[in-house]
């Protein structure tokens, strides 16, 4: 694993990581082209061609757009950020950002707790995103084509675009080099 934009603080024990993003950290390419940044701390690795990554994401939702995410990155203009984020209304939201030069930001389900489970699966050039409240029953959020000819990196991100910092806990982490068979069932 390697850092892209090192975290303000980081610790890891057993199957848990805590990552702290400093102020004004984000990864976004605004459709209005007024805000383009990629300074959020990311802990990344090179995944297999086909894989399933699962992790629970938990944080305190202190400031607008504070978030923790699973990230799949091809380069600075092509990436997916699957984020558990405090949205513009103050809600805790499942958010997926697919960037192919410009970010396509999709605000999905509102979550009532500070913790949710995420799953990102890759099968060839198809990426599927899921969430779960308990890590057992998975709900499909997004199913898309993503050009994956170049070397990809996969990992974890913390962000605090408007706040002073955001401390994110990633736990229940599971990585399998496996091709998903049924995108609707998540296995």
Where are these regions (language model features)?
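Extracellular glycan-recognition regions
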Residues: 1-187
